[in-house]
């Protein structure tokens, strides 16, 4: 759910260009599926004006993206900023699928994972589906054309696994030269995170 009022966009700081090693794409509606190697499920709780709302989020991972894919995204963002990134993501094949309650979801074209002291972090960015009203009235919200999120998986205490989803965002560089999420609406907090490590070709 998106804010109706035209308030100032929120900004979430991200240190340096290392964020690009986590980038994820969702193209348009999901058409292709592959064998799942892992499935992560969570409940997303609204914050701010969405407080009290709860939706389900599922990320099916078929395979991890390569260092070559990461380099393409870094170069594309450097040359074309947020739109360059969106264009590059739209050309990549699907390596997963992201589903949200009430939608059929999106194909995911880039997924990256890094180890942490307690487990793993998986951060994703998807191409956001622009709504009819946004396109018809040519609203400013169309520039927030990514949906981003992250899972912090705790392998030692799974009850401490958390995450966040940013429904409408874009990537910008601030005055200090740092990469930031520029948020159109409040983030959603991920709770009750379940990590299902499946068998390729089976589940």
Regions found by a protein language model. Give the residues of each.
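N-terminal secretory signal peptides that target proteins for export/translocation
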Residues: 1-11
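Bacterial N-terminal signal peptides
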Residues: 16-27
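Boundary at the C-terminal end of the N-terminal hydrophobic targeting segment
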Residues: 30-32
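Long, low-hydrophobicity ectodomains and other hydrophilic envelope-associated domains
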Residues: 34-203
């Amino acid at each position: 759910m998106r804010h109706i009022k035209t308030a100032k966009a929120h900004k979430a700081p991200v240190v340096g260009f290392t964020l690009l090693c986590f980038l994820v794409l969702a193209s348009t509606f999901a058409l292709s599926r592959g064998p799942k190697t892992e499935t992560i499920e969570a409940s997303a709780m609204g914050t701010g004006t969405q407080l009290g709302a709860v939706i389900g989020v599922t990320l099916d991972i078929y395979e991890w993206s390569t260092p070559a894919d990461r380099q393409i995204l870094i170069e594309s963002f450097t040359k074309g900023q947020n739109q360059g990134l969106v264009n590059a993501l739209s050309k990549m094949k699907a390596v997963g699928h992201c589903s949200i309650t009430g939608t059929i979801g999106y194909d995911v074209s880039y997924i990256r994972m890094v180890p942490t002291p307690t487990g793993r972090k998986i951060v994703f960015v998807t191409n956001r589906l622009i709504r009819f009203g946004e396109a018809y009235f040519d609203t400013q919200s169309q520039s927030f054309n990514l949906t981003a999120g992250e899972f912090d998986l705790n392998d030692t205490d799974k009850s401490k696994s958390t995450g966040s989803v940013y429904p409408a965002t874009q990537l910008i560089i601030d005055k200090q030269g740092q990469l930031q999420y520029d948020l159109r609406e409040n983030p959603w907090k991920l709770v009750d995170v379940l990590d299902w490590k499946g068998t390729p070709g089976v589940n």
